[in-house]
Structure formats: C-alpha cells, structure tokens
C-alpha cells in the first residue's frame, strides 16, 4: 500500500514518516509539508494519506484527496459538525473513498474515552481536564471535547452536574461542552494528557491517560491506514476499528 504523509516535518508527521518507512507492508510514496504541491501525492500513486497538518489547511487537503479518490486518515483537529457535513457532501460523488477522522490515535486514549462513557451514568458529577504542550493550536483538545460529548450523551436524562457557583472569574469553571466542564492546561514539557473526574457521595473515580511520546499514536494510525478501505465514507473516531461500541 502506497502511503503519503501531510505535515511531514511536524513532530507527529515526522513520527508517521518513520513509522510508514519502517513498515514492511507499506511504501512511503510522498512526504509533504507547508508549501509543497498536493499533486505530488497523485504523482506518487498514493493510495492513503495520513494528515497531521493544521485546522486552517486540512479542509483543502481533504477536498483534494476526495476528488482524487485517495483515502485519508486524519489526526488534525479543529473539526466541527459543519466540517463533518462538508466532508460527507464531498464524499457523495466518491462512494468508494474513505475518510477516517479521529481526535486521538493513541489506543489508551481511545479506551479511556470508552471507559468514561461507560462510567458516566453512575456518578453525580463529571469534569474533564486536558493538558498539552503550549504549541497546540486549539483548546480544549479534540479528545477532551469528544470525551465530554460522550459523557453528556451517556448522562442524557440525568440531572446536571451539581454546582453552586454563583460568581467566578471568566473561564474559572472551564468551557461548557454539552453541560460538562472541560479545563485546558498548556505547559512546557507536556505532550498529551487527560483526566476524566467522576464524583458521587463518598467516592471519586479518575480515568487518566498520558501520551509520553508521539510514538503512542503510531499503532492506531497504522491500524487505520491498513483498514480504512473497509469503511467507505466518513468514519469519526478509531472506536469502530477496535470493536468498541
């Protein structure tokens, strides 16, 4: 399988270049960064592209890839409901093309989101804290936002988080994602970390995941690359490939 990497000079992208080059069953067909023409992908007969670029350019990348029938595995963040709808509209004309967009490719992070969804309905309170390096473009992270949405979905019909706060400084209680407070930390020395806190009378459950190195994303990305053709259309999250429902 011929695989191209977009964002090849970034920290995650460079990790993916090395991973693809080291895989016996994959061929690195192109490695592109800012300013490189996307036509290099078609020139290299690329079948699947790994995109770890920037929210400002990822939609243009996807439009090109879909138009050319190239499958896409996307770790770039910043996707909204409107962006997902746009991707789906492009895919209508290319029913055999696959796009997988995931907020996190670390297997442990995907499992932690799944565990949080399972635990959510058993506790009165839930909050999310995400911690990342200071170069991250958005806050909260895509993983934290998705985690909060999964928790809110699992708690549908239950009372809201108890919170007697009547006055606070702006942002002190975090961002509100579907009723779940999400707090973002940006600190030198961090890579990617998340804590999900659940509380009820007499006990607290903490689900924590730490990516200590960007190689933690490699197994999930390569799994998606190898299996993406099995899922035409848009897939959001790595969960379907791990049989997590």
Swiss-Prot record:
Chief location category: cytoplasm
Recorded GO CC terms: cytosol
Protein family: Belongs to the DapB family.
Superkingdom of the organism of origin: Bacteria
Catalytic activity, as annotated: (S)-2,3,4,5-tetrahydrodipicolinate + NAD(+) + H2O = (2S,4S)-4-hydroxy-2,3,4,5-tetrahydrodipicolinate + NADH + H(+); (S)-2,3,4,5-tetrahydrodipicolinate + NADP(+) + H2O = (2S,4S)-4-hydroxy-2,3,4,5-tetrahydrodipicolinate + NADPH + H(+)
Enzyme type, top EC level: oxidoreductase
Protein name as it appears in the record: 4-hydroxy-tetrahydrodipicolinate reductase
Pfam families: DapB_C (PF05173), DapB_N (PF01113)
GO MF entry, a single one: oxidoreductase activity, acting on CH or CH2 groups, NAD or NADP as acceptor
EC number(s) from the headed UniProt entry: 1.17.1.8
Gene3D superfamilies xref list: Dihydrodipicolinate Reductase, domain 2, NAD(P)-binding Rossmann-like Domain
Pathway assigned to this chain's UniProt record: Amino-acid biosynthesis; L-lysine biosynthesis via DAP pathway; (S)-tetrahydrodipicolinate from L-aspartate: step 4/4
Entry-linked InterPro entries: DapB_C, DapB_N, DapB_N_CS, DHDPR_bac, NAD(P)-bd_dom_sf
Job of this protein: Catalyzes the conversion of 4-hydroxy-tetrahydrodipicolinate (HTPA) to tetrahydrodipicolinate.
Location of the protein in the cell: Cytoplasm
GO annotation terms (biological process): diaminopimelate biosynthetic process; lysine biosynthetic process via diaminopimelate
Annotated keywords: Amino-acid biosynthesis, Cytoplasm, Diaminopimelate biosynthesis, Lysine biosynthesis, NAD, NADP, Oxidoreductase
């Amino acid at each position: 399988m011929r695989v191209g990497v977009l964002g090849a000079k970034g920290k995650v992208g460079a990790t993916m270049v090395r991973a693809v080059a080291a895989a016996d069953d994959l061929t690195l067909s192109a490695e592109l960064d800012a300013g490189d023409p996307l036509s290099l992908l078609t020139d290299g007969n690329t079948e699947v592209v790994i995109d770890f670029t920037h929210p400002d350019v990822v939609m243009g990348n996807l439009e090109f890839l879909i138009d050319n029938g190239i499958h896409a595995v996307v770790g770039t963040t910043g996707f909204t409901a409107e962006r997902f709808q746009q991707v789906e509209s492009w895919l209508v004309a290319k029913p055999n093309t696959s796009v997988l967009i995931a907020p996190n490719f670390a297997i442990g992070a995907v499992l932690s989101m799944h565990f949080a969804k399972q635990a959510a309905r058993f506790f009165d309170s839930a909050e999310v804290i995400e911690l990342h390096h200071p170069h991250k473009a958005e806050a909260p992270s895509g993983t934290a936002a998705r985690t909060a949405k999964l928790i809110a979905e699992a708690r549908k019909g239950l009372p809201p988080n108890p919170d007697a706060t009547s006055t606070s400084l702006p942002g002190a209680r975090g961002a509100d994602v579907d009723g779940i407070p999400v707090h973002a930390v940006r600190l030198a020395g961090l890579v990617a970390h998340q804590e999900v806190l659940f509380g009820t009378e007499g006990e607290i459950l903490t689900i924590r995941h730490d990516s200590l190195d960007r190689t933690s994303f490699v197994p999930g990305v390569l799994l998606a690359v190898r299996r993406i053709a099995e899922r035409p259309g848009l897939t959001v999250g790595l969960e379907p490939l791990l049989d997590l429902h």
